[in-house]
């Protein structure tokens, strides 16, 4: 069974950039719903497998992708944020960003543009392309998980579902994007980068 991970900080810790009300609803209601629905879907899937019911297995795929993706994405997202975040990464990750995007500012512009440009709900991502050995920006619709749908290893995810910002930023997604850079946990992103290079 999957369970809701604890946040590594208090709900109000990311103020004023992301307010406590958003964090509480986002974590304790939205993420919790993905976890519960994923567990329910997996139970139904096991039953369908046991019965050899391929039609039922196929019918469950969208729910598995949506709720499984929601759980994977949010579990990464919470650790990608920190009250002590912001600034720029250091060391090898910064060098890789400069190599693959020209500069940190250009990278920031591109990931912001990809995230703002998601139509409807979805995610902006910095991922690692293991085959080519470099960083890549991608956007995924809904809760589609980055690795499961593109093969890129997720390093940094930006949630652009309205539930991630609407209570504070209303319909002005670019303002939310501007604010979130102040709480990006570059240590966590760097750890993810170093792990996938091994």
Swiss-Prot record:
GO BP term, pick one: regulation of transcription by RNA polymerase II
Keywords of this entry: Acetylation, Manganese, Metal-binding, Mitochondrion, Nitration, Oxidoreductase, Ubl conjugation
GO cellular component: mitochondrial matrix
Annotated positions binding Mn(2+): 26, 74, 159, 163
Protein purpose: Destroys superoxide anion radicals which are normally produced within the cells and which are toxic to biological systems.
InterPro entries per record: Fe/Mn_Superoxide_Dismutase, Mn/Fe_SOD, Mn/Fe_SOD_BS, Mn/Fe_SOD_C, Mn/Fe_SOD_N, Mn/Fe_SOD_N_sf, SOD_C_sf
Subunit structure of this chain's protein: Homotetramer.
The EC number(s) this enzyme carries: 1.15.1.1
Lineage: Eukaryota, Metazoa, Chordata, Craniata, Vertebrata
Post-translation changes: Nitrated under oxidative stress. Nitration coupled with oxidation inhibits the catalytic activity. Acetylation at Lys-98 decreases enzymatic activity. Deacetylated by SIRT3 upon exposure to ionizing radiations or after long fasting.
Protein name per Swiss-Prot or TrEMBL: Superoxide dismutase [Mn], mitochondrial
Keyword RNA-binding listed: no
SUPFAM superfamilies reported in the protein's UniProt record: Fe,Mn superoxide dismutase (SOD), C-terminal domain, Fe,Mn superoxide dismutase (SOD), N-terminal domain
Residues modified as N6-succinyllysine: 44, 51, 98, 106
Molecular function GO terms recorded: manganese ion binding; superoxide dismutase activity
3'-nitrotyrosine modified-residue sites: 34
Localisation per UniProt entry: Mitochondrion matrix
Protein encoded by which gene: SOD2
PROSITE patterns reported in the protein's UniProt record: SOD_MN
């Amino acid at each position: 069974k999957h369970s809701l991970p604890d946040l590594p900080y208090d709900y109000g810790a990311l103020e004023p950039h992301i307010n406590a009300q958003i964090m509480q609803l986002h974590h304790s209601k939205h993420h919790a719903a993905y976890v519960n629905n994923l567990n329910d879907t997996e139970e139904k899937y096991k039953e369908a497998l046991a019965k050899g019911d391929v039609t039922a297995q196929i019918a469950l795929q969208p729910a598995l992708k949506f709720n499984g993706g929601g759980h994977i994405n949010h579990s990464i997202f919470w650790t990608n944020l920190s009250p002590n975040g912001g600034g720029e990464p250091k060391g090898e990750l910064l060098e890789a960003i400069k190599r693959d995007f020209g500069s940190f500012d250009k990278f920031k512009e591109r990931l912001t543009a990809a995230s703002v440009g998601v139509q409807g709900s979805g995610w902006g991502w910095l991922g690692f392309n293991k085959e080519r050995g470099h960083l890549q920006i991608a956007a995924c619709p809904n809760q589609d998980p980055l690795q499961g749908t593109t093969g890129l290893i997720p390093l940094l995810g930006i949630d652009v579902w309205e539930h991630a910002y609407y209570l504070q930023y209303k319909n002005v997604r670019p303002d939310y994007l501007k604010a979130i850079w102040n709480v990006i946990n570059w240590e966590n992103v760097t750890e993810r980068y170093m792990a996938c290079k091994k």
